[in-house]
From Swiss-Prot:
Lineage, top ranks: Bacteria, Pseudomonadati, Pseudomonadota, Gammaproteobacteria, Alteromonadales
Organism: Shewanella oneidensis (strain ATCC 700550 / JCM 31522 / CIP 106686 / LMG 19005 / NCIMB 14063 / MR-1)
Protein name, as recorded: Ribosomal RNA large subunit methyltransferase M
One Pfam entry name: FtsJ
Keyword terms of this UniProt record: Cytoplasm, Methyltransferase, rRNA processing, S-adenosyl-L-methionine, Transferase
Domain of life: Bacteria
Any GO BP annotation: rRNA processing
Gene: rlmM
SUPFAM superfamilies: S-adenosyl-L-methionine-dependent methyltransferases
Length: 361
């Protein structure tokens, strides 16, 4: 297949497009981008007929900042007849054999989501016909490719596949997280999603566990502290503002009424550092770099607020500078990841893991 379909947040098509253009070029997969503002998706059309097949194999989804999900796709199936939408889609998927799951999706826009009821109903007959054609297995199999059919409008869809080991497990790439009734703020969901995004489920028991010490810079009123407390951690919450009373009553939180940029931990036994401050992204990055150079944490999750223009360029400049500074200061082993999470708005979330091969303390 020659098209790569990428889901993203509405309004971030330009950033997603710039990123896939650069990353595909690094893999020598030439092509061009087709996108419109606020469509919540980008199509990268490769020059080679198998270009998208190469990208879904060689380009890790987790390494992309602005794409929530991606799949190798057919040409746009336009004007699907109401009398038989199934046959053209089955024909477009003839290259796909023995897939393990079917997802009939839409982009994440209000207009496209009006098709969601139709998509649910349409999944049943489409699934039956794909099983008959051999494109879909009779039983779901999480280790086989996933078939995606994305309706971008009535009677208009892209059809294709993703690989199960390089794909979001979530429908449309969107995690379904519930806002806890006692969480101090909606920002709490950002850290909840970040843990799921950056720490594999099988490693969470070791890396996100009860009894750990954590620091939350810019903690007020406690949305991110809440997620740390919920996981049994002891938290130094740093903010001049007031903290949520229920959080303080847990006995797991010590509130330091001071500026997060000036705070220095009294004890150097911090595993997690988290930070969601409304501040210039370069200044936040410099703060995290200083903590890393001092060895004051093992893993950090922090948000970078995005400028109105040149957002992809700005993020990449900050991440590249951070890598250079860490290396210049003797920190050669680290893992740096960045994602525009579903619960992020005009910001991205970054994860920095220092010396992943070495155990903590």
């Amino acid at each position: 297949m020659k098209n790569l379909f990428l889901f993203c947040r509405a309004g971030y098509e330009k950033e997603c497009a710039a990123e896939i253009q650069q990353r595909a070029a690094e893999l020598n997969v030439g092509g061009f981008v087709k996108t419109n503002n606020n469509d919540a998706y980008v199509v990268y059309q490769c020059f080679e007929d198998d270009g998208a097949d190469t990208l879904v194999k060689q380009l890790p989804l987790d390494s992309l900042i602005f794409a929530r999900q991606m799949f190798a796709a057919s040409e746009l199936l336009a004007d699907l007849p109401e009398s038989d939408r199934v046959s053209p889609i089955v024909a477009a998927l003839s290259e796909v054999s023995k897939a393990g799951e079917l997802r009939v999706e839409t982009p994440d826009t209000n207009e496209a989501k009006e098709l969601s009821a139709f998509c649910r109903k349409f999944t049943v007959p489409l699934r039956q016909h794909l099983k008959k054609s051999g494109s879909l297995l009779a039983q779901e199999n999480p280790k086989r490719p996933i078939i995606h059919v994305c309706f971008i409008g009535p009677g208009r869809a892209y059809a294709g596949y993703s690989l199960s080991n390089n794909s979001s497990p979530n429908f449309m790439g969107i995690p379904r997280l519930k806002m806890a009734a006692d969480a101090p703020s909606r920002s709490s969901l950002k850290l909840d999603e970040a843990f799921a995004q950056f720490v594999p489920k099988e490693e969470q028991e070791e890396r996100v566990r009860s009894g750990m010490n954590a620091v939350d810079l810019g903690a007020c009123p406690g949305g991110w502290t809440y997620q740390l407390v919920r996981r049994g951690m002891f938290v130094s919450a740093v903010d001049n503002g007031p903290m949520n009373e229920k959080l303080m009553e847990t006995g797991q939180v010590k509130h330091f009424r001071e500026d997060g940029f000036r705070f220095e931990p009294q004890r150097k036994n911090i595993y997690w550092l988290v930070c969601d401050m409304v501040e210039k992204p370069a200044r936040v990055a410099e703060l995290i770099e200083a903590w890393a150079i001092n060895g004051w944490f093992k893993e950090a999750i922090f948000n970078l607020k995005l400028p109105m223009k040149s957002r992809y360029k700005e993020v990449m400049a900050i991440l590249n500078t951070m890598q250079d500074i860490l290396k210049e200061n003797g920190i050669t082993e680290f893992k740096l990841q960045c994602k525009h999470l579903y619960h992020d708005r005009d910001e991205v979330t970054v994860h920095l893991w220092l010396k992943p091969s070495q155990p903590w303390n």
